[in-house]
UniProtKB/Swiss-Prot annotation:
One of its GO terms (cellular component) is cytoplasm. It catalyses: GTP + H2O = GDP + phosphate + H(+). Its cofactor is Mg(2+). This is Tubulin alpha-1 chain. Pfam families: Tubulin (PF00091), Tubulin_C (PF03953). The record marks Y451 as: Involved in polymerization. It comes from Aplysia californica (California sea hare). Tubulin is the major constituent of microtubules, a cylinder consisting of laterally associated linear protofilaments composed of alpha- and beta-tubulin heterodimers. Microtubules grow by the addition of GTP-tubulin dimers to the microtubule end, where a stabilizing cap forms. Below the cap, tubulin dimers are in GDP-bound state, owing to GTPase activity of alpha-tubulin. Dimer of alpha and beta chains. A typical microtubule is a hollow water-filled tube with an outer diameter of 25 nm and an inner diameter of 15 nM. Alpha-beta heterodimers associate head-to-tail to form protofilaments running lengthwise along the microtubule wall with the beta-tubulin subunit facing the microtubule plus end conferring a structural polarity. Microtubules usually have 13 protofilaments but different protofilament numbers can be found in some organisms and specialized cells. Keywords: Acetylation, Cytoplasm, Cytoskeleton, GTP-binding, Hydrolase, Magnesium, Metal-binding, Microtubule, Nucleotide-binding. Undergoes a tyrosination/detyrosination cycle, the cyclic removal and re-addition of a C-terminal tyrosine residue by the enzymes tubulin tyrosine carboxypeptidase (TTCP) and tubulin tyrosine ligase (TTL), respectively. Acetylation of alpha chains at Lys-40 stabilizes microtubules and affects affinity and processivity of microtubule motors. This modification has a role in multiple cellular functions, ranging from cell motility, cell cycle progression or cell differentiation to intracellular trafficking and signaling. Its EC number is 3.6.5.-. It is an enzyme of class 3 (hydrolase).
């Protein structure tokens, strides 16, 4: 079996977790109490969904997930919500004081009191797996718990489970909408710490998702529930190949193999289509060609950046629903001929395709229309460096004045960590720049480079 353990850290992680597990349960026909009428075999059979759910002797399906927050209020909503019976009480872990948007509190002072308990629970989940393939970690960059505690957890997971894949789903601070002034600090500190521990990180930018909700779903003022349900659909598309028998199956390590050309360049850009409200869907025929085309519209991306200014290194199309390979090949051929998609010259235009015959499911009473087919595109493009550049710039503005730094130092951090993290991100931007340079021109001077 190829099990995956999901770890949801901090408010953003937990709330995205709620949306994801709600959707998984609907997709697999699992009731909120964990019973699954369609599953006739009692005990852990070799059903594909057992990658995400473990099965008890009584036929109850329990998510292989841990929810962690340093303060109780958000996880308490899970404890008293619709799905309270789905999770084992030990899977919901909370501390008493929050990280107060402070990376240092999440990573050092408050985080270290909880980390051993969390690792212990993760160990219990890992012991129930016959062949654990890795971890999916959900968190935000901006919050104290999401940034500080996650990076501490990643370091410890690398020690305990060295070779297992670790994929992150990270909420990137939106360029305009901000929940904390110190987001740039937290983001850069957490990215620096987790860079060497994460195998692949899918970033989600709140503002990009706000815009998609406003533009495509006509929601005037999107709430976090609207955003998270959309994020849930994307996570579901990425993990569908692990949970269903697909025609072309993709597992966790396969993503990395196809999307990550160098260990540090592991931030694929995700795009999802069609995002459409029920009123509109009724009048539109969404063919494979149309949804494939939509993936190359910057408007449908989950991070604000412009791939037309960058180059693609790899591209992975995950289709689900009523899709046949012939249509996909035709759609991709069309795109290759007329699109201005620039691949780096050291990577022949490779599209990796996955097809899953399970159509997308929607949450009843949600905003998304029920569609016959959908696609999620994961592409590794140099354009995502724009997102880092924006963040680094904000960091520089504050750090030049050493604003707010005393809060971090007061929690046991050293000021040197700031400059070290910032240098690491400058190096990351440089890495992206070098990857996009044509190898023919650069051959002479780059002899001494490590690549």
């Amino acid at each position: 079996m190829r099990e995956c353990i999901s770890i949801h850290v901090g408010q953003a992680g937990v709330q995205i977790g709620n949306a994801c597990w709600e959707l998984y349960c609907l997709e697999h026909g699992i009731q909120p109490d964990g019973q699954m009428p369609s599953d006739k075999t009692i005990g852990g059979g070799d059903d594909s969904f057992n990658t995400f759910f473990s099965e008890t002797g009584a036929g109850k399906h329990v998510p292989r997930a841990v929810f962690v927050d340093l303060e109780p209020s958000v996880v308490d909503e899970v404890r008293s919500g619709t799905y309270r019976q789905l999770f084992h009480p030990e899977q919901l872990i909370t501390g008493k004081e929050d990280a107060a948007n402070n990376y240092a509190r999440g990573h050092y002072t408050v985080g270290k009191e909880l980390i051993d308990l969390v690792l212990d629970r993760i160990r219990k989940l890992a012991d129930q797996c016959t062949g654990l393939q890795g971890f999916l970690i959900f968190h935000s960059f901006g919050g104290g718990t999401g940034s500080g505690f996650t990076s501490l957890l990643m370091e410890r997971l690398s020690v305990d489970y060295g070779k297992k894949s670790k994929l992150e789903f990270s909420v990137y601070p939106a360029p305009q909408v901000s929940t904390a002034v110190v987001e740039p600090y937290n983001s850069i500190l957490t990215t620096h710490t987790t860079l060497e521990h994460s195998d692949c990180a899918f970033m989600v930018d709140n503002e990009a998702i706000y815009d998609i909700c406003r533009r495509n779903l006509d929601i005037e003022r999107p709430s976090y529930t609207n955003l998270n349900r959309l994020i849930g659909q994307i996570v579901s598309s990425i993990t569908a190949s692990l949970r269903f028998d697909g025609a072309l199956n993709v597992d966790l390590t396969e993503f990395q193999t196809n999307l990550v050309p160098y260990p540090r360049i592991h931030f694929p850009l995700a795009t999802y289509a069609p995002v459409i409200s029920a009123e509109k869907a009724y009048h539109e025929q969404l063919s494979v060609a149309e949804i494939t085309n939509a993936c190359f519209e910057p408007a449908n991306q989950l991070v604000k950046c412009d791939p037309r200014h960058g180059k693609y290194m790899a591209c992975c199309m995950l289709y689900r629903g009523d899709v046949v390979p012939k249509d996909v090949n035709a759609a991709i051929a069309t795109i290759k001929t007329k699109r201005t998609i620039q691949f780096v010259d050291w990577c022949p235009t490779g599209f990796k395709v996955g097809i899953n015959y399970q159509p997308p499911t929607v949450v009843p009473g949600g905003d998304l229309a029920k569609v016959q087919r959908a696609v999620c595109m994961l592409s590794n493009t140099t354009a995502i460096a724009e997102a880092w550049a924006r963040l680094d710039h904000k960091f520089d503005l504050m750090y030049a004045k050493r604003a707010f730094v005393h809060w971090y130092v007061g929690e046991g951090m050293e000021e040197g960590e700031f400059s070290e993290a910032r240098e690491d991100l400058a190096a990351l931007e440089k890495d992206y720049e070098e990857v996009g340079v044509d190898s023919v021109d650069a051959e002479g001077e780059d002899e001494g480079e490590e690549y």
